[in-house]
């Protein structure tokens, strides 16, 4: 009886094994297997053709912006000397036109030229009619050239003078605070001191260094 059962189960086992083998063969020979095989061949061919230390071109290996090429120091020095010589010629001939300057005074920056008026919301310990020199000059410009400070220009290179022409007070400003049904009301009048300056002259050195 046991031999008959074993003989009957043996064909069933062989049939299942043959079915499983046929499924694995069909799966390996399908379109997915072909694509995987071609991808593996392509990867192996790329790895074989790329040299040692090859870095692919990406946004990290090669940035999208152009490479900055620094100028030659000798060429830059020669160009600087030419520009300075040309500016010296303009200054010596007085052909620079009307000068303007950017000065730092009373915690503000002012762009001024000759005969300009500056209204400063501050009180200065200077009497009317006195002449002062603005030492913090950030920039001086003309028609054809501009001298930039880093951050300030030297005192021996530029001179800006001004005169105090008026010391007065601002127009009264009323600051009113009120809360209804609270019996709260506060009134304050604000008056700030003011000083008016007139720019007299803007002068530059006769020759740059």
Curated annotation (Swiss-Prot):
GO molecular function, one term: structural constituent of ribosome
Subcellular location per the Swiss-Prot or TrEMBL entry: Mitochondrion
Domain of life: Eukaryota
Record key words, sorted: Mitochondrion, Ribonucleoprotein, Ribosomal protein, Transit peptide
Transit peptide stretch: 1-50
Signal sequence residues: none
Region (Disordered): 46-70
Similarity annotation: Belongs to the bacterial ribosomal protein bL21 family.
Quaternary data: Component of the mitochondrial ribosome large subunit (39S) which comprises a 16S rRNA and about 50 distinct proteins.
Identification of the protein by name: Large ribosomal subunit protein bL21m
């Amino acid at each position: 009886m046991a031999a008959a059962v074993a003989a009957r189960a043996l064909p069933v086992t062989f049939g299942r094994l043959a079915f499983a083998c046929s499924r694995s063969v069909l799966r390996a020979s399908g379109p997915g297997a072909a694509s995987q095989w071609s991808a593996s061949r392509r990867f192996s061919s790329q790895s074989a053709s790329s040299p040692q230390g090859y870095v692919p071109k990406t946004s990290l290996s090669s940035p999208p912006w152009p490479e900055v090429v620094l100028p030659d120091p000798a060429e830059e020095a020669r160009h600087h000397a030419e520009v300075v010589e040309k500016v010296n010629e303009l200054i010596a001939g007085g052909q620079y036109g009307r000068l303007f300057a950017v000065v730092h005074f009373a915690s503000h920056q002012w762009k001024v030229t000759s005969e300009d008026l500056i209204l400063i919301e501050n009180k200065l310990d200077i009497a009317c009619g006195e002449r002062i020199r603005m030492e913090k000059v950030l920039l001086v410009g003309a028609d054809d050239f501009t001298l930039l400070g880093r951050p300030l220009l030297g005192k021996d290179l530029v001179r800006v003078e001004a005169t105090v022409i008026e010391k007065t007070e601002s127009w009264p400003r009323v600051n009113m605070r009120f809360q209804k049904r609270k019996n709260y009301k506060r009134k304050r009048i604000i008056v700030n001191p003011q000083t008016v300056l007139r720019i007299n002259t803007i002068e530059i050195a006769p020759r740059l260094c």
